[in-house]
């Protein structure tokens, strides 16, 4: 073993298997790039991102942990979201949930 080496099983690692997902279109209406991280509650992302926030409540980006998606100014892109797991409680961000999801 090499210090810091990560040993994984052969094959592909599947993320978020069995969790509900949804695909939404997002537009950055700001004049600056906006980046959203993998575990950020997407409905509370930067207000310059235009999308169906009610639909996105309780979801985050369906990307590997530690990654982010960058939205360039004026850019429209489609992203896949995955339901927040665990106890499905959200605190912080813009303070719009502050507890259990309904």
Swiss-Prot record:
InterPro entries attached to this UniProt entry: Urease_beta-like (IPR002019), Urease_betasu_sf (IPR036461), Urease_subunit (IPR050069)
CDD domains attached to this UniProt entry: Urease_beta
Catalytic activity from the UniProt record: urea + 2 H2O + H(+) = hydrogencarbonate + 2 NH4(+)
Family (UniProt): Belongs to the urease beta subunit family.
Claim: Repressor is one of the keywords in the record: no
Alphabetic keyword roster: Cytoplasm, Hydrolase
Keyword Nucleotide-binding: no
Quaternary organization: Heterotrimer of UreA (gamma), UreB (beta) and UreC (alpha) subunits. Three heterotrimers associate to form the active enzyme.
EC supergroup of this enzyme: hydrolase
Organism: Bordetella pertussis (strain Tohama I / ATCC BAA-589 / NCTC 13251)
UniProt GO molecular function: urease activity
Enzyme Commission (EC) number: 3.5.1.5
Pathway per the UniProt entry: Nitrogen metabolism; urea degradation; CO(2) and NH(3) from urea (urease route): step 1/1
Domain of life of the source: Bacteria
Gene Ontology biological-process annotations: urea catabolic process
Gene3D superfamilies cross-referenced by the UniProt entry: Urease, beta subunit
Protein name: Urease subunit beta
Assigned GO CC terms: urease complex
Subcellular location(s) per record: Cytoplasm
Span of the signal peptide: none
């Amino acid at each position: 073993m090499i210090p810091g080496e990560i040993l994984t099983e052969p094959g592909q690692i599947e993320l978020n298997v069995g969790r509900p997902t949804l695909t939404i279109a997002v537009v950055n209406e700001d004049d600056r790039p906006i980046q959203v991280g993998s575990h950020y509650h997407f409905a509370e992302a930067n207000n310059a991102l235009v999308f169906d926030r009610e639909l996105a409540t309780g979801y985050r980006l369906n990307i590997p942990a530690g990654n982010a998606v960058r939205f360039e100014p004026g850019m429209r892109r489609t992203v896949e979201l995955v339901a927040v797991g665990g106890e499905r409680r959200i605190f912080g961000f813009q303070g719009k949930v502050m507890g259990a999801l309904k």
